[in-house]
Every structure is written in structure tokens, then in C-alpha cells.
Regions:
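Glycine-rich and polybasic anion-binding loops at the starts of cofactor/ligand-binding domains
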Residues: 1-179
């Protein structure tokens, strides 16, 4: 089975194991339709004429890898932004790690998207900005959106300055041959 078909076939199982807000669900469904129609980009597309994805799409991937990584702070601390105080949102193999993250609501919001979606006060901001920067008809953007489980929500009000840098850190353990 080709990777595109494997992804499309597995999306229903992905949906069933993901608890997600209705707003996000709508974005994911529309994105899946775009990916289904366009598939992976090929060299026939001007922007991809010098890049072949054949070596990527012709592999067998674990689409839903196990995420029992056991990573501890001592394993990843050296990858954080120097040794200064920052707000951190950390993901391990695509899964949020509350133990490695340091978020805030001290006059600004640095938290998980799901946490922001659960609060009515954030709805106007999310409706105005969420998923606006993505090129919606680009197939790889659509694929990423279709399988999105979680994200970071950062809101800094006008005339407010974050006292600490904000880091969004993604670690891949390499334990699974994940896409």
C-alpha cells in the first residue's frame, strides 16, 4: 500500500484516539480532503521541480508510534536555550510533556492550544488567527494539519512584553520509524 493510501486509511483510527475540539476537527477534515486530492508533491510542481520526495514516501512508517519514551529533564536540558529562565512548551515524539514544560498565565498566555480552546475568553483570538498563516492548498501543510493532535497557544497582549524568552521544543527519540 502506498504511503498516501496508508495515511488516508489510518486517519479514521487517528480521529478515534484523539480528543480534539470541534474547531480543530473541522480544520483537520478539510485538510485531509486537500491532501487526498493533491497527494504528495512531485517534481511536476514548479516549487518542487528540484526536490524529489520519492525516498521519503517509499518507506514504511509507524504512523502511530508508542510514546512511552521515559525521557527526563537531565536528558534534554542541554538542548534548551542556554541556561536562562524561559517559558517552555516541550513535545516528545509529538506528545506534550507537562513535566518538561514551563508555561505561564502571568499577564500573557503561553499554554497548550487545547487549554486555550477550553476557555471561552480565548475564542475570539483563536477564531481570528488560528490556521490563517498556513497555505491551505499545499499538500504537505494539509497533511500536517490533518494529523495535528496538539499545538502551542501564545498570546501577548498589546503593549505587554514577555519577561522571558518563549521556547517551543520538539524532541524525537528515534525509537520508532515515525513519519
Amino acid at each position: 500500500m502506498e504511503l498516501k493510501e496508508k495515511l488516508l486509511d489510518s486517519h479514521l483510527a487517528f480521529e478515534e484516539q484523539s480528543e480534539v475540539n470541534e474547531t480543530i476537527q473541522g480544520f483537520r477534515t478539510r485538510a485531509l480532503r486537500v491532501f487526498e486530492k493533491k497527494g504528495f508533491p512531485t517534481r511536476k510542481i514548479e516549487a518542487w521541480k528540484y526536490t524529489s520526495l520519492a525516498s521519503v514516501v517509499n518507506k514504511n512508517y509507524a504512523l502511530f508510534p508508542r510514546t512511552d519514551s521515559g525521557i527526563e529533564l537531565k536528558h534534554v536540558k542541554r538542548y534548551f536555550l542556554y541556561d536562562i529562565d524561559t517559558y517552555k512548551i516541550v513535545f516528545i515524539d509529538g506528545i506534550y510533556s507537562p513535566f518538561l514544560s514551563e508555561t505561564t498565565h502571568d499577564g500573557l498566555d503561553v499554554c497548550l492550544l487545547s487549554a486555550a480552546l477550553s476557555k471561552q475568553k480565548y475564542k475570539p483570538i483563536i477564531d481570528k488567527y488560528f490556521n490563517k498563516a498556513a497555505v491551505k492548498d499545499e499538500s504537505l501543510t494539509a497533511l500536517n494539519t490533518a494529523f495535528a493532535k496538539e499545538g502551542a497557544y501564545i498570546y501577548i497582549p498589546k503593549n505587554k512584553v514577555s519577561e522571558n524568552p518563549i521556547e517551543i521544543v520538539h524532541f524525537s527519540t528515534g525509537e520508532q520509524k515515525a513519519l
